[in-house]
Amino acid sequence: MEDYRTIRGTATGEYEEKKSRFIAQLSFADSEEKAVAFLEQVRAANRTARHNVYAYRLREGNRERYSDDGEPAKTAGTPALEVLQHSGLTDLVVVITRYFGGVLLGTGGLVRAYTTATARALEAAEVVTVRSVVELEVTVDYSLYERAALLIQAAGAKLADPQFTDRVTLRWQMPEGTEPPLLEQLRELTRGSAQVSASQPFYAPF
């Protein structure tokens, strides 16, 4: 599987026109079950809203879904989905809640409102790249701890909090395939005594 871009957690964007409020809530979702669960969560929290429009994109099966939820066809879910498509992001869902202000907006006004609210939620989101990574671990003497940690950080790895016992255990993540130069540096630092264990590759934001 290739690297891909998505968002971390959730984000919100709002737009108001003629007293109608459009609240776009965006969330990471890597399955249809998670996307639907987020939709139901937003619906439950906004039971008095006139509409809860949604759109989502999933890597799994290249699925894309949307709903206008009672708005005129192609004025709500379609423009929201198009914003997600143009972003290049996947594994995410957006639910746009509309609180009606009493004034009809027309086709153009609705498209603009749902597009803008979704775009603002994307602007507020933290975008991450999901890559194939490995988690590695090495135990060193206290005398080598700081130098080993500096080597790991200089390699661009994500270093977790060390564990201190009679020695120091360091654990970190880095993209799969980038670890050989660092492992060689650690062997040189420890004069060949470093025993590094590595996990199977897995996909995670990096």
Predicted regions and their residues:
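Short amphipathic alpha-helices in soluble, non-transmembrane regions
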Residues: A148-A154, P181-T190
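Short glycine-/aliphatic-rich beta-strand segments at the starts of folded cytosolic domains
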Residues: V127-L144, W172
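C-terminal regulatory domains involved in ligand/effector binding and gene-expression control
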Residues: M1-T75, S197-F206
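Flexible, glycine/charged-enriched surface loops at secondary-structure junctions
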Residues: H51-N52, A125-S132, A160, Q195-S197
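Terminal, non-globular segments
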Residues: W172-P181
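Active-site beta-strand/loop microenvironment that shapes enzyme catalytic pockets
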Residues: A76-A125
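Short amphipathic alpha-helix segments
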Residues: T139-K158
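Conserved short beta-strand edge segments in small beta-sheet-based binding/regulatory domains
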Residues: L159-Q163, T190-F206
